[in-house]
Amino acid sequence: MSKSTEYIEVYGAREHNLKNINVKIPRNELVVITGLSGSGKSSLAFDTIFAEGQRRYIETFSAYARQFLGGLERPDVDKIEGLSPVIAIEQKTTNKNPRSTVGTVTELYDYLRLLYARVSDAYSQTTGKKLVSYTEDQILDAIKENYKNEKIMLMAPVVRSRKGHYHELFVQMAKKGYGQARIDGELTDIEYDLKLDRYKTHDIDIVIDRWIIGESASEARMEKSLRTAMDMGEGLIGIQKLGSTEIEYFSKNLMDAETGHSLALPEPNTFSFNSPKGSCQSCKGLGTIKKINTDYFVENPKLSINQGGLLPLEDIKSNKYILSQIKNILEIFGLGLATPFKDIPEEALDYIYHGCNKEFNKDLKYAGISKKIKINFDGLIPFMEELIEERESYEAILLERHFTTEETCPECKGARLQPSSLSFKIDGKNIAEVNGLSLSDLKEWLADVKDKFSEKNSIIAHEILKEIETRLQFLLDVGLDYLSLSRSSKTLSGGESQRIRLATQIGSQLVNVLYILDEPSIGLHQRDNERLINSLKNLRDIGNSVLVVEHDKDMIMEADEVLDIGPRAGKFGGEILWQGKPKDLLNADTITADYITGKRKIAIPEVRREGNGKSIVLKGATGNNLKNVNLEIPLGKLVVVTGISGSGKSSLINGTLYPILNKHFYRAVQEPLPYKKVEGLDNIDKIVDVDQTPIGRTPRSNPATYTGMFTDIRNLFSELPESKIRGYKPGRFSFNVKGGRCETCQGGGLKVIEMNFLPDVYVHCETCNGKRFNRETLEVRYKGKSISDVLDMTIDEAVDFFQPIPKIFARVKTLQDVGLGYITMGQQSTTLSGGEAQRIKLATELAKRQTGNTLYILDEPTTGLHFEDVKILMDAINKLVELGNSFIIIEHNMDVIKLADHIIDVGPEGGKYGGEIIAKGTPEEIIKSKKSLTGKYLKKEM
């Protein structure tokens, strides 16, 4: 290999905050890029190297194909040499599609379907007996053998347990010359006027021929009649001895000889929940159905229906007919639309919700007569169900969003497949049962089942099993043994979906590729981290270059080469501070090196907080893998929940406790996982879940609008003398309202180019040059800065700029306090990472007036944070705890765990081997626990 191709050489990289840097990255090695959050790590790895790799790939397409992709912009870099094909494995949650599962993403389910299509056995749904299939020759031989010298009838089963009068069928059969049929066990002549009871279920077998085996029946006649019967019965025939009521069935398909129940031979799509051939008819292969929940119908029972008390009516536009029917129902009970909801009796509500078809006599006392009231109303719930099923209007979407809950499909019990697909089994398990096994159990089952195959099936299954086992092992190697193939992709964390993609890439066995990963250690316990590092080394050892953006100490120390970018974030970063082998970090003069060598550290508190003596107690939590857990959260403390990936931390906190609290305080829709009872809810006055979901989904949303300070900034600009002269109000300085904004881009600063089947592309508006406002608005300046200049400021600059204005200053200061000084005020929320979005939410909470009695829940807040940023974040959190608030943090980061006042360790392992609280107490108590794996790693840290 020549010298020039031993490195990926980047010259003059200026993307985002990069300061025209040159860097040589060794190929076929594991290289870690580290540095403070916002220092430019992702700008180098993803926005420069990956973007250029992707652009070069698209350049290879034909001009015709490129017109649909649009010109991918060349990153701001002079040149990059020695670049291999690039694959980026990012943290983004893979798929919000409810049909996507771990099995479909990894393609393991496709191989499993193939395995079941080729080597499974079918069993009868009624008798449980194994189904058999025959060839035509075997059927003929069996008939000759079993019915020697007997008089028999050959029949074609055409209807099996179905309702209908079947008049057309009998007319058709009579025209073809067939004279008799066995209908519901009775032999009947076929007449042109024959009609059955249409509301009863029937079995109909057409008599095709009569034989005396060995005498009247010639070989040629038997073969011809048998073929006719087979065609008519779709592979199934029946044989009945004359004078007997018993019938014996034979099938080319799989069949139960007792009942005649028949199944087609399986194909891979027999087991696909995305194909009509395999999916459950009721839920269409989703495993869940949406059910209307009346608990969400009424928020304030003191209001009447006239005052908007019955919420679904607010979402239904054409509600005049419904209102008239409800009015009639209430009139029967002597009530009206002005009656408070709490005074409406249960019987009346039953009529309103589920319908009524009756006539009532209503006495009109004042007139001394009675009045007839006829009610013919299907009910509010059936009306809503019909609207939701059609999904043709926006109101249907609103009704589904506001008034339904997701329930397991009662037909398939969540298996997603038809009963016939679940009749096929290998070693007693159907495909849905195997799909529901944890990956570690699946490995055991495959090893066990291999030895039980017949010689023929062993040969057929050999290659399929090899593929399944190889891919499965890669998933186990990246610490995902607790997941099952049936787990829905939308429930995976960013870290889990990234590791699934990593395992899929390792499974593809590509070589000479540059892999770029974004913090693969997210969501991993220290123990699983070691397995992940080995997987990355494996990827390197087969002949690939691996570039990892990472803050994890173990990952940095295990790398072949480390790049440290800094020195600070935003415009104060973007330089290569140090590059070399991890062992030489001792001599480096950077913040990262100081934390790794121990010169800087996050100090362990001298005393742990006592809390306020109150607590929230959750009893009997059994959701997912939880084993009847009793959880006590002491209040007024920093509580950290730890445990192996998949041990049940999220099920306990995000799946059970948070939905209970959210329902109690805010009447939220999400149902908690099963539990027995909860105590102590009155010990807090509100609950805040600071998660990593985006703060906005369009480029119009930004930190200034989310925190609410943009309103104050607009008010400030409207109070300036220039604005007063021109008559500008605060709305003039909004980019969402006509008047002050640029009308070409409607205040977006960007124009959206729709790409039909591809994601939309955003380009700068040529009229305002991305400034969002028109020329007149930009002429109004405060301290020499226009409203657009203010949005372009970093938070650090805004802190100095707005010092004289307390209201705005307080809000920008909290953003600076959580370590976000490097982002700009108007940065599009779509470009913020999950960790940044989470800290903006935290800053917004910090800026609010404190009641000192709030419970905050954070899930892995250190995602994307450097050691120094973790310190800043924990200082901000501790400020809130000092004010009397309580925190529950789910975290694997030892720097956070060691600061806890109280630790709850869930385990001992992931999946079915987890789901218990194995240790609780202060960090000092946890490190003494023999059971706690977290304690073992925490001991090293402390």
What is the predicted function of each stretch?
Residues 1-942:
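Conserved phosphate-binding elements of NTP-dependent enzyme cores
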